[in-house]
Amino acid sequence: MKVLFINSVCGIGSTGRICTDLAQQLEAEGNEVKIAYGRKGTVPEQFQKYAVRIGTDFDCKMHAIQTRLFDTHGFGSKHATKEFLKWAEEYKPDLVWLHNLHGYYINVEMLFDWIKKHPEMQVKWTLHDCWAFTGHCSHFTMVKCEQWKSHCSYCSQLRRYPACFAMSSVSKNFERKRKAFTGVKNMTLITPSKWLADLTRQSFLKEYPVEVHYNTIDTSIFKPTPSDFRERYGLQDKIIVLGVANVWEDRKGLFDFYKLAEMLDDRYVIVLVGLSEKQIKELPKNIKGIQRTNSPQELTAIYTAADVFVNPSVEENFGMTPVEAQACGTPSIVYEDTACEEIARQNGNTVVPQDVNALYESITGHKFAGGVTNKCTIICIPRTNSPQELAAIYTAADVFANPTYEDNYPTVNLEAQACGTRVITYDTGGCRETIDGKTCEYLTKTK
């Protein structure tokens, strides 16, 4: 069987690694696999045999400019999509497995027109957020919007991803998506959390069967891994509270970490992995920032070094980081009423109400093995694309905190748990599904 994955990235980032993990599994079963991707980024050498680039960096930039000006995300990249579909027509896949279609790289109308012309193909679509059934945004829990259930006419998040700073096309986008994404034969939707599945069944995609497939981790990588992480950052006598995200913003709980940093005493330090250089420069002194890493080995070492992993995301679909932290021996804390709670409660982690005070009480009430009583600092480190570095950070931390509001399914929660670090997160989005309330916890988010 010929299988074609379509995703924004290949082999990097959470969705990129999910695609390559599935590709390896399918290839081992005797299938031929390709992964079509569009965003700039180095494909790891071991996955280059799968990779097929859609368009160029210039195409992505032009698509982004169109989005900024006309709010037409997903409807640009016509030439790039045309050339890709010529290749796909020759490849003749038996199974087309869609993942993230947003990301400034493909024209979804042209893609679905082609799919509908081939009813003989099996189609799967793994949703990692809510973009497919809204007129603009990828998450709406934090702003408490329910327009997507019937028709999006106005978006209060127009300047958030995929940001537009000029003309709004929210209403038109909603109808174009509805027309493009409905009426596909043999298509099954997959979500990594019950939370997202429930939302999907309330949208115009309700005509399709929806399956819940929880994201999994490689326990041969995410396991307790000793490292010199604490020594390198001078944290030998600190209780490390760890947070990990691909991109840090308010819905991921970044500001909850800021509040937490003001509340924790000098015994603690917060380490945040996945920050931009600009964010790191703006951090308070008691937070250590690390840039994003695509190295599972680095992540494992960080997970192992941490004392607790916290995922305060409120819109996570299904965060892998709490599970990864736990696999590395670090307990996790997440927020309730999120997808993170689903998995958290299954894996002996702590789930707390969505409130920074509850997060604080859970962290300070935890009895850490080292009995550390000296000064504490919140650590933020420049973003890293090395999973190995991330794993090392997870492991080194005492607590992983994820105060995100809108994560679909925060893999950082699973990663921190897999590395043995305790996670604390909010009970919104998919966060609830990543925490089971035994060794990690979630908090109820309140204003």
Ranges and model annotations:
Residues Q147-L189, Q202-F204:
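Membrane-proximal helix-turn-helix segments that form the acceptor-binding/catalytic region
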Residues V314, Y405:
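Aromatic "clamp/platform" in nucleotide-sugar-dependent glycosyltransferases that forms part
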Residues D198-R201, I217-R232, K281, F368:
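Acidic anion/phosphate-binding donor-loop and adjacent secondary structure
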Residues P331-V334, N413, R422-T425:
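Short hydrophobic beta-strand element within catalytic cores of glycosyltransferases
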Residues G274-Q297, G371-T384:
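Nucleotide-activated donor-binding/catalytic signature segment of Leloir-type glycosyltransferases, i.e.
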Residues I302-A306, I393-A397:
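Short alpha-helical donor nucleotide-sugar binding micro-motif in glycosyltransferases
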Residues N349-V356, G365-K367, G437-K447:
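Conserved acidic donor-binding segment of nucleotide-sugar-dependent glycosyltransferases
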Residues G234-K252, Y258-E262:
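Conserved donor-binding/catalytic core segment of Leloir-type glycosyltransferases
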